[in-house]
C-alpha cells in the first residue's frame, strides 16, 4: 500500500499555484494505468492533469490525467499545477469534496456536500476515485504487475463541442444509442492503426470501424491515456463523437474532412495519434 505523505502544501511559483507533495522513504514505484487521488489524514491535495514527459535524469512526475503515477524516490518532491478541481481528504467528515465549476458539477451530478468515502478508506493512504460511482475504493496491486487498472476517474463531462454524425445506416443500434462503453472491461480501447482495428474487429464477424473525434472529446473534458502495450484507452465515447465507415471499402472520412477543415495535424501533446480535423483514433 502507498505510504502516508509527510507534507502537502501549496506554493506559488512562476507557473502559478502548485501542489507540492513530499513522500516518505520506502514509497513503492507505481506503474501502469492508474488513476489516483491521495486520501491522507488532515491533508488536501490540489492537482491538475499534466502531460510533461519524463526528463532524462529526472525522477518520474505524477501524471494524473494520463493515469500514471511514476516511480518517486524517497525524499523527492513533485509539484503539479493546480486545475479547476481539488480532491480533498475529509476522513473526519467521511466524504470527499470537489472544487468544480458549477456547470460541470451539475452535469456530473455531484452532491454539494461531497462524495461519500468508503469507510475502509478513512485511515487509508491512497485510493482510486470514480466520479461515475460517487465513491472511493482502495486500489490493490496485482501480483507481478504493480498498480494497474486500479480504477477510473472522470474529471470532465460532455459539453458543447463539435458534433459528428454517427447514425449512418448499418451502424449497430446499441452503439448509435449509447456510444462505446467498456461494459465488462475497465476502459474502451482505441487504435490508431486501421490494420490492427481490422484484426480485432474481425474476431467476431465483419469488421466495422468507428472514427473517434478525440479532439472534441478532449475539449469536452474526457481523458485519454496509454497502456503499457501501446493501446489507447478512455472511459467512454458518446455516440455524437463517432463516425462509422467500413474498413473493407477503405473509405476513410479524413479525405472529406481535409477538404473542409484544412491540413492534418498531430496531437503529440494529448494522444500522439494522427488527427484529421479533430477526428483521430479508431475504436
Swiss-Prot record:
Keyword Transport attributed: no
Source organism (scientific name): Deinococcus radiodurans (strain ATCC 13939 / DSM 20539 / JCM 16871 / CCUG 27074 / LMG 4051 / NBRC 15346 / NCIMB 9279 / VKM B-1422 / R1)
EC number assigned by the record: 2.7.1.-
Similarity-based family: Belongs to the KptA/TPT1 family.
Described function: Removes the 2'-phosphate from RNA via an intermediate in which the phosphate is ADP-ribosylated by NAD followed by a presumed transesterification to release the RNA and generate ADP-ribose 1''-2''-cyclic phosphate (APPR>P). May function as an ADP-ribosylase.
UniProt record, GO biological process: tRNA processing; tRNA splicing, via endonucleolytic cleavage and ligation
Name this protein carries in UniProt: Probable RNA 2'-phosphotransferase
Listed SUPFAM superfamilies: ADP-ribosylation (SSF56399)
Alphabetically ordered keywords of this record: NAD, Transferase
Database matches in InterPro entries: Ptrans_KptA/Tpt1, RNA_2'-PTrans_C, RNA_2'-PTrans_KptA
PANTHER family: PUTATIVE PHOSPHOTRANSFERASE, TRNA 2'-PHOSPHOTRANSFERASE 1
Source organism, top-level taxon: Bacteria
An example Gene Ontology molecular-function term: tRNA 2'-phosphotransferase activity
